Every structure is written in C-alpha cells, then in structure tokens.
C-alpha cells in the first residue's frame, strides 16, 4: 500500500525534510493488526519483534515522501503503543522527517497527558509529530471491559458531551505545543470544526475526514 500511494502521487524522491509531507497523502497502520499478541503481558516480545517492522514501514513511507500515522488502540494498549512509537520515532534513520504521526482519542481520559508526552518526545528528538485527534472508536468495548473486570471507573468518558469538551480541551493543548506538534482534526461535526477554527487563531493545522463523508463541510 505504501508503494502504491507513493507512486500514485509521484512523491518518490521528494525532500523528506520539507513540510511538503503535510500536503502529501498518508497511510495509517494498526499495530494490533501487525502482531498476534499485541498486549502488555508480551511487552518485551512486542518491542523486540514489532518495533523493527514498524520502523521499516516508517522508513519506507519516508522514502516515498508520504505521511505515516499509527492508529489508536484500546486504552489497555496505550502504554505499549507509546513505547513502540517512542522507540521507532527516535531512530536516527528518521532524522529530519516530520511524516511520522499518530492518532489520539479524545474520549480517553488520558488524552491531554498523551499530548504532553508526545510534545516532550518531539522536543527531545528535535522534530514535530503530526497528531490526528479523533473522538474514539472503541467505546462499547471499553465500557464492557471495565464492567467485566470490575474496574473502579471507566478509562473513557461515558457521556458524549464530556467527550466533546475533551476534544476541544485536547485541541487547545495541541496548539499550545505548536512548536512540537502538527495538529490534525478528524471530525465531521460542524460545531467542533468551527470551535477548532476559533481556537487555532490562524495557526496552521488541518481537518481530516473519512472518504466519502463530510464532503459538504
């Protein structure tokens, strides 16, 4: 898929260190789809076997001049995902390339802290991280797991309005870290889009949508 996307837009050979990567197409990968036991109990094996594959895909995306986004997972995999991202994003082979990003889910209560972690990582490594803010895709599973395991609380917000507020609060924090993060907002909600525009105050960012949806917006 990386080869196909890169060749379709003739991005091969483009300057990987330039900001043009933000205007280029991008590809998303799901870590749990690349490894059969993607769970914290297998952390050492995941880091040893999956991290090299994730890095290789990132290097391939860079060679084609396209973006590379790691999709969000369920909350119990968050720390593992951040470990993989930190290990691969920091690799010297990606120096000067700002195409390596990830998705953050606003319905997770830890979203603002994830943003702070990513900003710190970006500053330590010396290049920006594109961050796609989404509302979240695993609500039913997250709530069910918390109930089955008898957890004292839920890792996600259980009311839509709380998620909406979290989305805007997290968006504001992303802009606060504008030197370290490139904000990307994936939503089809017109009110949220208008609010993000107001928060941005002219600072650079982009809106994203699912193919075939939200065209009028």
Give residue spans per PLM region.
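Positively charged, amphipathic and often flexible ligand-engagement surfaces
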Residues: 1-217
């Amino acid at each position: 898929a990386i080869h196909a996307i890169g060749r379709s837009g003739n991005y091969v050979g483009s300057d990987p260190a330039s900001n043009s990567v933000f205007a280029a197409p991008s590809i998303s990968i799901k870590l749990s789809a690349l490894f059969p036991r993607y769970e914290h109990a297998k952390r050492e094996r995941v880091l040893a076997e999956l991290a090299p594959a994730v890095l290789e895909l990132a290097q391939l995306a860079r060679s084609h001049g396209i973006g590379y986004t790691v999709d969000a997972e369920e909350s119990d995999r968050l720390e593992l995902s951040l470990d993989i991202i930190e290990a691969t994003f920091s690799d010297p082979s990606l120096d000067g390339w700002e195409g390596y990003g990830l998705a953050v889910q606003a319905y997770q209560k830890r979203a603002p802290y994830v943003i702070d972690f990513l900003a710190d990582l970006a500053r330590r490594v010396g290049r920006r991280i594109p961050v796609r803010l989404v509302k979240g895709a695993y609500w039913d599973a997250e709530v069910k797991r918390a109930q089955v395991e008898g957890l004292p609380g839920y890792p996600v917000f259980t009311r839509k309005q709380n998620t909406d507020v979290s989305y805007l609060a997290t968006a504001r924090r992303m802009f606060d870290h504008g030197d370290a993060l490139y904000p990307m907002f994936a939503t089809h909600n017109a009110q949220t889009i208008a609010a993000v525009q107001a928060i941005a105050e002219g600072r650079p960012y982009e809106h994203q949508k699912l193919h075939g949806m939200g065209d009028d917006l």
